[in-house]
Amino acid sequence: MALHEAGHVISAMLMGCNLSSVELCAQGFTIDLDRSASGYKNIVILTSGPLINLLCSLFFIILFQNSDSYFVSFNLSFGLFNLIPLKFLDGGRLLEEILDICLPTDLASRICSVTNTVLLLITWCFSIYCFLFENTHSSSMFICIFTLINLCLDK
């Protein structure tokens, strides 16, 4: 996670943006920028965290070709997971920034809300199916509940 957040911080500094806060929360760290960052700067900053994870995975795949490295798996999974367009992940904030550039703000917000709801519903149904029929653990159901609570509290 530290590499991921370092990617955000370094790109923010390179873009001339100041950090207003860094907080440890239930889903990891959150970094808030000052309001000087424009839509395009935010897109670069939001993309840089997952990009660092994906580049680290690629680097270790090339470096240790015959290895089943946990580091590779974690960074690849973490980078891709953060690109899921849920509001509290980089992907959700990225979707919001892109839509804000292309569409009126209220329409962009509605699209993001619908996207969050649909993704949560799909994940919830899939996790229930896996729990009932595939005999897997229920952690994804708890993630859905946690995400839903976060979304409700955020409104």
Spans of features found by a protein language model:
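Hydrophobic transmembrane alpha-helices and their immediate loop junctions
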Residues: 1-155
